[in-house]
UniProtKB/Swiss-Prot annotation:
It comes from the Bacteria. It comes from Rhizobium rhizogenes (strain K84 / ATCC BAA-868). This is Histidine--tRNA ligase. GO terms for cellular component: cytoplasm. It holds the Pfam family tRNA-synt_His. PROSITE patterns: AA_TRNA_LIGASE_II. The keyword Cytoplasm applies. The keyword DNA-binding does not apply. It is an enzyme of class 6 (ligase).
Length: 504
């Protein structure tokens, strides 16, 4: 084969599965949203901190390395000292490591918030990505459930700060101790029943999806779905199933609290959990948060195994249309709970902790559905065109650009091939530039510049029928002294803003 036939293959540009590139509008929307979240957290007295993207794999807790490679659920690599590191799976486990490592220097209670990307080595799907952003808030070193109540109130305030009205969201609260008490009361206490307890938790977690009848099947012998696939159940008997369904079916906690307390009486943690729920309910009510905002709801079962007490979830209650065209409730956008065991793994002593995570991408989708995000105007930059390439001319163009920027106006000088002026105006049109600044040799000699109102010009171009009329009208273009450049640009931008406002 000749050398001519051996053409080097081009590298194929491809995005890894489960990852997305982010556009300017997405980034601005996230920045707008996180700024509002951050303001609420700051008002509550929380401080920011960051942890690295990589942690030693054993610090993540849920995903310990196997003999060859710790690849279940996390992205991992082996360092040159043969230690395994993984991209963080969430923001909570790295926080626990940070607190344990700096325990003697940290002031407890430690109130902190963090925003950042987390990574899941899982099969991607529609709306399910391997990299996504979370925004967390946590209190470390506060053993009382008043810290959990504060988290619930902060979740409610955050959603309202983002423009979500009361009635469109609900903070639902349960307690893992109560659930564990119910399981103990029906004979599922002890280490030997751990697997069966986990199956019960998974069944309860499907309540919204399958309803009480479907959950009853999953608690009992099992359930066959529409495709014929069979999911083995938890193997409970009818009496056990009735007690579990009573617990998760409680609609009015105040009416059922006494009956629930009776059910878990005599269990190691159940009674304590009921008291904690009652305390949280009293605290949030005293602070002005009624049950239409924060509600005790025993059907909340968060899947992470390290929750040890109160668990809470922020649900958006308005309807949206799913990919099948069906009306469905939007659902959960944030959740968390008490995880007294997570920091303790490093310490050998109890370290109480509670906190929650907001799913930034999911919440952003909800806010866009409500028209609460991305509404702020972002005006494209004014374009200073380039007519001459000599040093003096370039210096003038750059000076015009800097004068506009100094006045707070977005501006850029054209950086492409300046010799094709038509391409500069095409660039301005595609970029959505509101104004083009033009100065050729004649204008430079007179100390003037031409200002082309591209927005008005585009509108009028549809009304003027021929080029002769266009040239005669000289619409949307005027010549001003260099000294008046900034003031005239400001006036044109203000007029364009008025036009947009009238068009709304």
């Amino acid at each position: 084969m000749s050398d001519k036939q051996k053409k080097p293959q081009k590298l194929k540009a491809r995005l890894p599965r489960g990852f997305v590139d982010r556009s300017a509008s997405d980034i601005r929307a996230v920045n707008e949203m996180t700024a509002k979240i951050r303001a609420v957290y700051e008002h509550y007295g929380f401080d920011p901190m960051e942890t690295p993207l990589l942690e030693y794999t054993d610090a993540l807790g849920k995903f310990l390395p196997d003999s060859d490679r710790p690849n279940e659920g996390v992205f991992s690599l082996q360092d040159d000292d043969e230690q395994w590191m993984s991209l963080r799976y969430d923001l909570t486990a790295p926080l626990a490591r940070h607190v344990a490592e700096n325990f003697n220097e940290i002031q407890l209670p430690y109130r902190t918030y963090r925003a950042g990307y987390v990574f899941r080595n899982e099969k991607p799907g529609p709306g399910r990505f391997r990299q996504f952003m979370q925004f967390d808030a946590d209190t470390i070193g506060a053993p009382g459930v008043q810290a959990d109540a504060e988290m619930c109130m902060m979740m409610a305030d955050t959603l309202e700060a983002l423009g979500i009205k009361r009635g469109d969201y609900l903070i639902r609260v349960n307690n893992r101790k109560v659930l564990d008490g119910v399981l103990e009361a029906i004979g599922l206490g002890g280490d030997d029943k751990a697997g069966q307890r986990l199956n019960v938790l998974r069944a309860i977690d499907k309540l919204d999806k399958f309803g009480p009848e479907g959950v009853a099947l999953l608690l009992g012998p099992g359930r066959k779905d529409e495709s014929g696939d069979f999911t083995k159940g938890a193997g409970l008997n009818a009496e056990q199933i009735d007690k579990v369904l009573f617990f998760v079916g409680i609609k009015d906690y105040a009416e059922s609290a006494a009956q629930l307390a009776e059910l878990v009486a005599g269990t190691s943690k159940g009674g304590e959990g009921v008291e904690e729920l009652n305390f949280i309910g009293s605290l949030v009510t005293s602070a002005g948060y009624q049950s239409d905002r924060i509600k005790i709801d025993p059907s909340v079962v968060r899947g992470l195994e390290y929750y040890t007490g109160p668990v809470y979830e922020a649900e958006l209650t308005f309807d949206v249309t799913n990919e099948k065209g069906e009306k469905v409730v939007f659902g959960s956008v944030a959740g968390g709970g008490r995880y007294d065991g997570l920091v303790s793994r490093f310490m050998g002593q109890p370290v109480p902790a509670t906190g929650f995570a907001i799913g930034v991408s999911r919440l952003m989708t909800a806010l866009k559905n409500l028209g609460k995000l991305g509404q702020d105007e972002v005006i494209a930059p004014v374009l200073v065109t380039v007519m001459d390439g000599d040093v003096e001319a370039m210096g003038r163009y750059q000076r015009f650009t800097q004068q506009l920027r100094a006045a707070g106006i977005r501006a850029e000088m054209f950086q492409g091939n300046w010799k094709k002026f038509g391409n500069q105006l095409k660039y301005a049109d595609r970029r959505g530039c509101p104004i083009a600044i033009i100065q050729g040799g004649d204008e430079r000699a007179e100390g003037v510049v031409q200002l082309k109102d591209l927005i008005e010009g585009k509108r009028l171009s549809g009304e003027i029928e021929d080029n002769a009329s266009w040239r005669e009208a000289r619409v949307a273009q005027e010549t001003v002294p260099e000294a008046d450049l900034v003031a005239k640009v400001q006036a044109i931008l203000a007029a364009q803003a008025e036009d947009r406002k009238r068009a709304e």
